[in-house]
Amino acid sequence: MASTINGSARSVAPERGVYGPDHEAFRDSFRRFLATRVVPGYETWEREGVIAREMFTEAGSHGFLGMAIPEEFGGGGSDDFRFNAIIAEEVSYAGVMSFGVNLHNDICVPYFLHYATDEQRHRWLPGLASGELIAAIAMTEPGTGSDLAGIATTAVLDGDHYVLNGSKTFISNGINADIVIVAARTESDSRHGGLSLLVVERGMEGFERGRNLDKIGMHAQDTAELSFTDVRVPVANLLGESGRGFRYLVSNLPQERLTIAVASVAAAARAVELTADYVNERKAFGKPLAAQQNTRFTIADAHVQTEVTRAFVDNCLALHVDGALSADRAAMAKLAATENQDRVVDACLQLLGGYGYMAEYPVS
């Protein structure tokens, strides 16, 4: 019986079928960018609680931001979401999940692509593609959580401005963000039909950022409380139509869920690979841990479950590229992938013993 375990998650990539040569070339380029520019400074940013802003402009200069933004605005000009998925995979695989490019690319940019006027596109898309503008979206409130229809932040029309009042919390990219898409209530007679999306820009009077929230993980992902006190937001900063914000928010959910699923599979695969390397080297009771039957069963089960989950998520990715991914199927992918990640990482951590609890070991 062999005393080593092959835990390579990379070895299955050629068999997946969802990516082509152009995608893999893009993957290699982005992987090099992470290894040379992001990973070396990541521990510092984790301690400081925020990613250095120049990482966004560097990502933009290499073509890793706004891949779906038209070329005339400095973007990649491709609506192929597989490029976005590669970024989500590689960020997660490299263990730099706090690098907020997925939020910028997959969650924020689509609102500008789908609902911005021509004037707004000229005003904001070039900066979003270059990284000069970092985006965030503010939905969650202290008293509403994920109940979007219960949003209490208000925006009252006053001439050619909306007067915005309210507060948001748990806003990712909240410290770095230059522009924030704020979900606010412009009509009070309908829970679902009275929301609108306003773009609040850095420096607007009455727009304040609270503390950078101290979390148990993803420390470099700046997460802030935001407050709005009589902020005068120009009508020209309304995204889409007034009162249709809830519909806009819900329409992007499948893609947001898919991004999380893709990242979760990559994180689980990386945990399996790291753990396989560890048990091959670590000796206990006179032989490598990899020679213990329980270890082999545990690694094999984690690897199989991750690859099965990956197959389902890849299917969802292909459906999304074809415009056929439903909200419920995307929710299934998110649920399956995150629960698998939880099980796999826990099993891997147990095999590392006390070292699994040490921050210097990536599995932790």
Please name every model-derived segment:
Residues D106-Y115:
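Helix-loop "lid/cap" segments that line or gate small-molecule binding pockets
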